[in-house]
Amino acid sequence: MLPAHKQTLEALLADSVTQVAHALKGADAAFVAPAITLERPKVAAHGDVACNVAMQLAKPLGTNPRQLAEKIVAALTAQPAAQGLVDAADIAGPGFINLRLTAAAKQAVIAAVFEQGRAFGTSDREKGKQVLLEFVSANPTGPLHVGHGRQAALGDVLANVIASQGYAVHREFYYNDAGVQIGNLAISTQARARGLKPGDAGWPEAAYNGEYIADIARDYLNRETVAAKDGEPVTGAGDIDDLDAIRKFAVAYLRHEQDMDLQAFGVKFDQYYLESSLYSEGRVEKTVDALVKAGMTYEQDGALWLRTTDEGDDKDRVMRKSDGTYTYFVPDVAYHVTKWERGFTQVINIQGSDHHGTIARVRAGLQGLHVGIPKGYPDYVLHKMVTVMRDGQEVKLSKRAGSYVTVRDLIEWSGGAAPGQEAAPDLIDEATITRGRDAVRFFLISRKADTEFVFDIDLALKQNDENPVYYVQYAHARICSVLNELKSRYNVDVAQLPGADLSQLTSAQAVSLMQKLAEYPDMLTHAAKELAPHAVAFYLRDLAGEFHSFYNAERVLVDDEAPRNARAALLAATRQVLENGLAVLGVSAPAKM
């Protein structure tokens, strides 16, 4: 049901309920109608819309729920505004109200799609509000792995979903460029620069083993220049003994590499925030001092502890260790203070499920500052791990990364790159990258974040209905082909289809497809509210299924103009909604396959 129709029907039902309540209790009786909840019945034969308001109000109004439902239905159908919307009403069971919409109400979605085009499904109800989404936020110590890829897909699609509701969305990447890992990166690069490799005597125990370290060392020695998108160019000094220079070059090199990974994945960020800046600007010290002054800390065993149990944590947590260094959640608290100070009253973090333990600590620290930050700030979407399968075997290693599969590997493999090509990316064409990006983005968003995901490379390469992204894209391409043939054979352009006689669309398959199209706006609203980007992928698979059912049941290219143009109009509307949904996922909508 279209949102406008839903709002109208909710208002009509609320008015009908009020009429019945006053008839039962008296016109002067105080009564406020409850929020009307409309749902689609699980069984199509029960109607198009179901409502349980009679069950809710029977006891307060002192009447039988079924009799109450009958009175509500009588009041509803008597209202002139309901005539073009409600075709029939039935009472089921103890008092459920089942409504059937008129054919015109169901067909109205086609006109709405034609009128709104790319904007169909979007809303401006949240215009003027802003949301910060932080995701990926990898250490600049290696290429992005498949876990980062899942974060990138979840974060980018969720950002698109939230933006569809009118929010101004700010995408942010937090670089953990301070700490032990960065030191390990520097000594790894230094060892490679000295000619050592993993397994050699003298190879540092904490060093990273991926081939990318050798690439960094080579470019450092060759005095190459690298730069991240938001950073100053850094030129390799070539000095093997200058560990600080090696560190700066290695971080810049890997940030640039991660930029390239994200570009291949179709993800753009509005801002990159460096953890190191929290220290250089004194924000970590300032945050700790504020918590001490607020009485939220105490000293024990030479360490500074935060009273996180005051905010529901299972035990207090160390903030500053006895050696004077901070535990990892302390800069996170300082970082989130900056988010609040920048005016972001709604913040969503996409992180791996292994970060679950930090949530209570960060929130406790923010509450302890007493600066007006609400409880439950920030929101979190936690995701589980990704397992990569190829040729029926789990893939655990990558030549590029050494100990894990990278996002770039996944894109190239899913695009059909031949084994060995990933070592020579110049051999991989843009079409391969596009196919791979489409598959990876769709696959990684096609399960709920809190479920583990098995990424099957072989499935991603299949060109049949088993492959979900192919299934959806093929539906779009098939419609494009039909509409091209419509123009070629009958000289009917899509621009002429809004004038089609939609009363021709009466088959069960046509009605079901129209109903699925009408669900798109509410699906986006629900996905934004519940932080559930997977809902878009679920919807598109269902929509493609409804299209295929319709297309297999009814011929579109027939000589009879009225049914032909009506069916073509339905296909054109379906194509538009497929395009809109795929755009939210950041997946292409090919006209040919």
Swiss-Prot record:
- Matches recorded under CDD domains: ArgRS_core
Question: Main EC class of this protein?
Answer: ligase
Q: Where in the cell is it found?
A: Cytoplasm
**Disulphide linkage map:** none
Keyword list (alphabetical) reads:
Aminoacyl-tRNA synthetase, ATP-binding, Cytoplasm, Ligase, Nucleotide-binding, Protein biosynthesis
Among the GO biological process terms of this entry, one is:
arginyl-tRNA aminoacylation
Catalytic reactions of this protein? tRNA(Arg) + L-arginine + ATP = L-arginyl-tRNA(Arg) + AMP + diphosphate
Q: Main localization of the protein?
A: cytoplasm
Molecular function (GO) terms listed? arginine-tRNA ligase activity; ATP binding
Pfam families in alphabetical order:
Arg_tRNA_synt_N (PF03485), DALR_1 (PF05746), tRNA-synt_1d (PF00750)
Report the GO terms under cellular component.
cytoplasm
Which InterPro entries did the record assign? Answer: aa-tRNA-synth_I_CS (IPR001412), Arg-tRNA-ligase (IPR001278), Arg-tRNA-synth_N (IPR005148), Arg-tRNA-synth_N_sf (IPR036695), ArgRS_core (IPR035684), DALR_anticod-bd (IPR008909), Rossmann-like_a/b/a_fold (IPR014729), tRNAsynth_Ia_anticodon-bd (IPR009080)
Positions of short motif 'HIGH' region:
138-148
EC annotation from Swiss-Prot or TrEMBL? 6.1.1.19
By sequence similarity, the record places it as follows:
Belongs to the class-I aminoacyl-tRNA synthetase family.
Query: What quaternary arrangement does the UniProt entry report?
Result: Monomer.
Q: NCBIfam families annotated for this entry?
A: argS
HAMAP family reported for this sequence: Arg_tRNA_synth
Please give the name of this protein: Arginine--tRNA ligase
Could you tell me which species this protein originates from? Answer: Burkholderia ambifaria (strain ATCC BAA-244 / DSM 16087 / CCUG 44356 / LMG 19182 / AMMD)
